[in-house]
């Protein structure tokens, strides 16, 4: 299994902590089951340094495991932000070259 970081981009005017929002996130995390290795945390404030293009502010992160990038993307599609004007960035975590750890 590979490890992936999910970074969330919140929809405009998203309000953190509403009962409906909490229920949607809980349901999504429950549906991913053992794939979730670190549920992560929301981000209260963020900014970018350098040229990051025109992206929404960072809304939070999680860490999951999946067989490959396609499976990780399939899991990410259930994120409550998807379809509401927000989104998820999916990236595979790897050990740096020369770290001595197997990739």
Model-predicted regions and their roles:
Residues 1-103:
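Conserved, structured core segments of small domains
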């Amino acid at each position: 299994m590979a490890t992936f970081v999910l970074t969330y981009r919140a929809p405009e005017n998203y309000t953190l902590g509403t009962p409906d929002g909490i229920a949607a996130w809980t349901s999504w995390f429950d549906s991913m089951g053992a794939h979730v290795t670190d549920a992560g945390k929301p981000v209260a404030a963020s900014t970018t340094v350098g040229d990051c293009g025109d992206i929404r502010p960072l809304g939070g992160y999680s860490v999951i495991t999946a067989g490959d990038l396609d499976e990780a993307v399939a899991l990410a599609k259930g994120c409550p932000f998807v379809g509401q004007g927000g989104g998820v960035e999916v990236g595979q975590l790897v050990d740096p070259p020369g770290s001595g750890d197997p990739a």
